Amino acid sequence: MSSTYCGNSSAKMSVNEVSAFSLTLEQKTGFAFVGILCIFLGLLIIRCFKILLDPYSSMPSSTWEDEVEEFDKGTFEYALA
């Protein structure tokens, strides 16, 4: 087995080698889309942890039973008989 020594070749790159690493428009769009998805995922994870830590703060003060009672009393004018 022969081993080769890789020195600091990044300092010796020519202009053609540097342009070979440039991204196309499709790659830039893909990376931007993945970045936006990662940010969205991070926000969802933070929101889920907030709900897990304090689940009752996000609930409204009225309950479904209160709304059903009002519906049975006929307080909604748009209800069809």
From Swiss-Prot:
Keywords: Membrane, Transmembrane, Transmembrane helix. Its main location: membrane. The keyword Protease does not apply. It is a single-pass membrane protein. The chain crosses the membrane at residues 29-49. It is found in: Membrane. GO terms for cellular component: membrane. InterPro entries: Cortexin (IPR020066). Belongs to the cortexin family. This is Cortexin-2. It comes from Homo sapiens (Human).
